[in-house]
């Protein structure tokens, strides 16, 4: 396990830096940030992605299942002298807004959809649109399942944390190796849940179509923009030809960015 997964302040700062240098620029042609802009992040963790939006004067809200992460988000924002509303709840069961003023101009969903298991994915996607304003935008980013560390094995403490593609092994063998590596049972269960989720580019785009979203922009990254913070590597897009080959492209896409709107 890398130190950043244990030092949550460092983790928060790195997410904020990537959001500041990459996500806001990615959104600029489609969204002007003002003090009236309402931003919701689903699966916000400690809130690092939201910090630059709060710095720009936006009204930000974060939702997360993990109560500890919500407490940390509140602490980090308070330390930064910024306002943000953070709520510990399950988004799928969250009450839908009833007025346009309660809805959001931007919904961020970053490194979340790969954690949602198959039976719940469609419900999750369908539940997003009621939270979005008529001209609002959704920004979703996720690592393709078959990429070298698409199983999130880097969160492990033992030898498996450094082995690429190990998550693609059959489940019984993968489970045995996780146990041999000395991983905690709760971590093993989390990794097996991600394996059951197995979010590919193709499945994601199918979900978008079936739940009523229109694609505005799509970028497949060979080197994830966040790797600049983690490993000092410059972001690189996946070559266009490679990005057009279904299934095969998942092995090379360390992050996929999508901007979506609701079909009206």
List each model region and its residues.
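Conserved N-terminal segment of class I S-adenosyl-L-methionine
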Residues: 1-102, 106, 122, 253-257
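Surface-exposed loop/turn positions
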Residues: 37, 135-136
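Active-site micro-motifs of SAM-dependent methyltransferase domains
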Residues: 93, 114, 147
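A short beta-strand submotif of the Rossmann-like class I SAM-dependent methyltransferase core
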Residues: 109-112
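Helix-to-beta-strand junctions that scaffold the AdoMet/dcAdoMet cofactor pocket
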Residues: 117, 132-133
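S-adenosyl-L-methionine-dependent methyltransferase catalytic module, highlighting the catalytic core
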Residues: 120-128, 137-258
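Active-site beta-strand termini and strand-to-loop segments that position acidic
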Residues: 260-263
């Amino acid at each position: 396990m890398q130190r950043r997964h244990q030092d949550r302040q460092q983790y928060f700062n790195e997410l904020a830096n990537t959001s500041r240098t990459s996500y806001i620029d990615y959104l600029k042609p489609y969204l002007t940030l003002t003090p009236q802009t309402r931003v919701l992040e689903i699966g916000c963790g400690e809130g690092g992605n939201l910090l630059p939006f709060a710095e720009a004067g936006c009204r930000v809200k974060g939702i997360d299942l993990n109560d500890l992460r919500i407490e940390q988000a509140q602490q980090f924002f308070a330390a930064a002298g910024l306002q943000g509303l953070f709520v510990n709840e399950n988004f799928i069961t969250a009450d839908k807004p009833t007025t346009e003023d309660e809805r959001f101009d931007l919904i961020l969903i970053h490194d979340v959809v790969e954690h949602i298991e198959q039976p719940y994915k469609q419900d999750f996607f369908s539940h997003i649109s009621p939270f979005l304003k008529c001209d609002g935008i959704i920004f979703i980013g996720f690592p393709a399942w078959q990429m070298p560390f698409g199983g999130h094995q880097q969160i492990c403490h033992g030898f498996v944390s450094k082995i690429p593609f190990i998550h693609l092994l059959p489940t019984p063998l993968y489970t045995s190796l996780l146990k041999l590596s000395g991983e905690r049972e709760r971590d093993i269960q989390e990794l097996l849940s991600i394996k059951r989720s197995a979010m590919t580019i193709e499945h994601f785009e199918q979900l978008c179509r079936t739940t009523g979203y229109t694609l505005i922009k799509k970028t497949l990254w060979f080197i994830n923009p966040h790797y600049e913070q983690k490993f000092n590597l410059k972001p690189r897009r996946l070559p266009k030809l490679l990005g057009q080959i279904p299934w095969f492209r998942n092995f090379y896409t360390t992050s996929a960015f999508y901007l979506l709107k609701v079909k009206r």
